[in-house]
Amino acid sequence: MTLPQILTPSIEKAVKVLFDVIIDKVEFQTTRKEFEGDITMVIFPLLKVVKSNPVELGNKIGNYLVENVAEVSRFNVVSGFLNIVISDDYYLDFFGGIKDDVTFGFVTPNPEDKAVMVEYSSPNTNKPLHLGHVRNNLLGYSVAEIIKASGKKVYKTQIINDRGIHICKSMLAWQKFGNGQTPESTGLKGDKLVGNYYVAFDKAYKEEIAQLMSAGKTEEEAKKQAPIILEAQEMLLKWEAGDDAVITLWKTMNQWVYDGFAITYKNLGVNFDCYYYESNTYLLGKDVVQIGLDRGVFEKDPDGSVWIDLTDEGLDRKIVLRSDGTAVYMTQDIGTAIQRVKDYPDVGGMVYTVGNEQDYHFKVLFLILKKLGFDWSKNLFHLSYGMVDLPSGKMKSREGTVVDADDLMQEMTDTAQKIAEDLGKLDSYSPEEKAKLYSTIGLGALKYYILKVDPKKRILFNPEESVDFAGNTGPFIQYTYARIQSIIRKANFDFSNKSKMVVLHEKEKELVKQLELFPEVIQNAAQHHSPALLANFTYDLVREYNSFYQAVPILGEEDLEKKIFRVQLSKKVADTIAASFSLLGINVPERM
């Protein structure tokens, strides 16, 4: 039980006994650093039902708790706040209960509960994953893991945008300029090779536009009449008609991209349970349009196009079917959502990890599904996030200046290597151990820097700053974990049995209090879809541990019971760091 769960019934009873008043809610908050106390009860709300001043009221309740609740040792009242000091016995008992609990903080899913499907990544198959995809993947993966740890079954999915004019641009450019190149013949990852041809198409397209404009065409006319764009449009029509040659090329080049993506995903440490492809889903939803028309949810215009009027909800009119009968993205997303629930009947909610430029789209999508009568629509959530910028500027993919995810990960590993080599202490490492350490530190720095920020906020990502071994960074936390592992390796005595400690040092108590927060932080992070809550909890835990480390001897402690307890406490902190970082997709090194 948590402290609020322990104290609330006793406080309710105290108010009934002392004032003959029944209350149904007790408000708690963390005790401010300048006051003594482990938890604070807010007195002000009670003044509405109890005729007393806050200090008198606080003192009466405090005295009652000291006399009747074993966990309460003393208290103090400051204005309208009752600061409660909890006994060492409570924290020692709590720690004894979690010391060997390898699943501490994690909740086992109930098979009867509905599952959650989390969508993330969802790339186009015409270029490599870039910096924006990195934030998307890290957020989606972490949120999925956190929701799973909170006690829900989770499916990780993505919808791959594998069709359309942008795909045909890469295909056409390869036909024109590729000379039969393959990933094998060039030594390039497949996604990078295909991305090169997307850039090549754009270059040729711009040259043709310039030529047409010099011949007297307007820019708008030139963009429409450039031969290469007309060829790409013709290729798209052939794809839609099922042309064998076009379909074969499409499958071949897409497979190159998938093979490249698989390497990036593996290096980034993310995975998926199921995949959806736009080529299979772009016609989904058209049947739903007729259902919507029959129910009066949609309306048909004279030109045959179908719309939904959401002006009363402040979202304007939205087209769901063009006049020529072709679907729009909204229609596809409606159909895909419905299909997912058909494929996975235990799914009762979905999380869409998509940038904030799509905020309007998802408001409309969720409202349409609600109006169509799907009960699960109330459990849809758009995990909206801001753009990631580098100090050198924003990304552009068509011009070949995109910040590739692969290049970024390599840069992070190289930066970590340079810093680690400058710090020294690597003489005993084999080349393989060094390479693993550099990757662990570099990717840990990247992931933590991105995930510690609230998803809604835009990020200016500074690679060198993220690899700093001091402050709120991944490497700082990893270093603390490795330091604890060193302590455990040096502990040449049995510390497995429960310590007979009876009095806690202030720093020990603060550390146990921080550990106690872990289960609640996981639940809050899941509820708010925010890995930042977990990341910053871990940083606070590490800061508390380093304060403890500086204040008291651990292996140098002469009292055996204290030494045993401090090693056990250190180990539990390390275990909690590792557990928390696992939910963020970050590895921890055994030594640094």
Task: Annotate the PLM regions.
Residues 93-98:
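Short, charged, solvent-exposed linker or helix-capping segments at domain edges/interfaces
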Residues 1-92, 103, 110-592:
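Non-catalytic interaction-recognition regions
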